[in-house]
């Protein structure tokens, strides 16, 4: 089974967590694109979706899935999204696609976070994948200096502007032993919008596409 086939299996497996008549939170990325394809097969059974990125919004609209503004929605039963890394405590690094802030907002609203990945994303310790940090443009150099003090090597992601009009610093060489603490430390730096650690609001259910099928993990 190829990596993309494992992503597809995980994406389609998430469909069973979607409630009829509900509005579904939808993330961003290659694995989520498979979930969107799956969601389109039951578009007449749901009210619609809230999207974490312009890319996902465009894909859903093209498939006939109604997309709502989050501010007009009181409740999201589930949020389905991928991860760049996830550990066995369901802490994640996200933001490789630069949609981390909107992803974090939608995840905060949802009652249940379903994370869908292929098995290459599972790790023991977070940090091999560079940690994305969304930054107000004028604060980029200042924030980079503060991230160096935390032990990281920040690199400006050239040519990328987020859906919110900000820039991304990718922080390399972090061995993240306490994800919740580091998430807070980085978010306290003036000029940071948010960072790609999802530890305070981690996943509730993890669906992993493997060569042997989809494996399900849940928080204790």
UniProtKB/Swiss-Prot annotation:
Catalyses which reaction(s): aldehydo-D-ribose 5-phosphate = D-ribulose 5-phosphate
Range of residues in the leader sequence: none
Enzyme Commission number: 5.3.1.6
Active site residues per record: 103
Top-level taxonomic group: Bacteria
GO CC annotation, single: cytosol
Pathway per the UniProt entry: Carbohydrate degradation; pentose phosphate pathway; D-ribose 5-phosphate from D-ribulose 5-phosphate (non-oxidative stage): step 1/1
GO molecular function list: ribose-5-phosphate isomerase activity
Keywords for the protein's UniProt record, in alphabetical order: Isomerase
Record-linked InterPro entries: NagB/RpiA_transferase-like, Ribose5P_isomerase_typA_subgr, Ribose5P_isomerase_type_A
Binding annotation for substrate: 28-31, 81-84, 94-97, 121
Biological role stated in the UniProt entry: Catalyzes the reversible conversion of ribose-5-phosphate to ribulose 5-phosphate.
Subunit organization: Homodimer.
UniProt family annotation: Belongs to the ribose 5-phosphate isomerase family.
Name the UniProt record assigns to this protein: Ribose-5-phosphate isomerase A
Organism the protein comes from: Shewanella sp. (strain W3-18-1)
Gene: rpiA
């Amino acid at each position: 089974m190829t990596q993309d086939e494992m992503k597809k299996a995980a994406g389609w497996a998430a469909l069973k967590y979607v409630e009829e008549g509900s509005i579904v939170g939808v993330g961003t990325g290659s694995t989520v694109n498979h979930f969107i394809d799956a969601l389109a097969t039951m578009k007449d059974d749901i009210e619609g979706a809230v999207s974490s990125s312009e890319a996902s919004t465009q894909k859903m609209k093209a498939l006939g899935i109604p997309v709502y503004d989050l501010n007009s929605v009181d409740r999201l039963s589930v949020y389905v999204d991928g991860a760049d890394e996830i550990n066995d405590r369901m802490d994640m690094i996200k933001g490789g696609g630069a949609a981390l802030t909107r992803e974090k907002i939608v995840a905060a609203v949802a009652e249940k976070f379903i994370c869908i990945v292929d098995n290459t994303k599972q790790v023991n310790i977070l940090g091999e994948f560079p940690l994305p940090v969304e930054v107000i443009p004028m604060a980029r150099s200042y924030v980079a200096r503060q991230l160096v003090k935390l032990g990281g090597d920040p690199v400006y992601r050239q040519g990328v502007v987020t859906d919110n009009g900000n820039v991304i610093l990718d922080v390399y060489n972090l061995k993240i032993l306490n994800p919740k603490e580091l998430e807070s430390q980085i978010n306290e730096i003036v000029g940071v919008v948010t960072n790609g650690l999802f530890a305070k609001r981690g996943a509730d259910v993890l669906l992993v596409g493997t060569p042997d099928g989809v494996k399900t993990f849940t928080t204790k």
